[in-house]
Amino acid sequence: MFLLEVGNLKENFAKYFSVEAAVTEELKHEVFRVRHAVYCEELGYENTNPDQEESDSYDARSLHIALRAQAHGRIVGCVRLVQCDPDAPEKLLPFEKLCTDAIDRSIIDPAQVNRHAMVEISRLAVLSDYRKRKGDSGSPMAISEEDMGTRDQPRFPYIPVGLYL
């Protein structure tokens, strides 16, 4: 990829998408519906729910971010920042709870980090129409060398980068 040739990342991203904090209940429900479409219906990582929303106990202490498509104004992606519980900082973040044996404490030891300054980024979800191209396999994410483009036609993965920024 020829990043310097891509141009201004923010301007290019803003042509197609806007990112907003999901602070209203209505917007949070839209985020939970996107997560359900991706994690439950498409990928089968979680069980489907009659309300067609995917949520868990960490959502109450999370900041939810929504990705809105400029073309039609609908929410097409999301991500969340799980914060440590201010009333019970000893409560673990999802990664700490689910992957405790995988954490290399010689690199970082969560027990030594200020709990109030720590968050976990999780539940990144993008509707398949915005994540996949025609001809992609049934895999959740298909990336190839061509995705980065060429010198004559550079490309950049705006959606995941935009959600993480």
What is each model feature region?
Residues L4-Q52, S57-A60, H64-R68, I75, ...:
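Short amphipathic alpha-helix that is part of the acyltransferase structural core
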Residues H72-R74, A88:
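Amphipathic alpha-helical interaction segments
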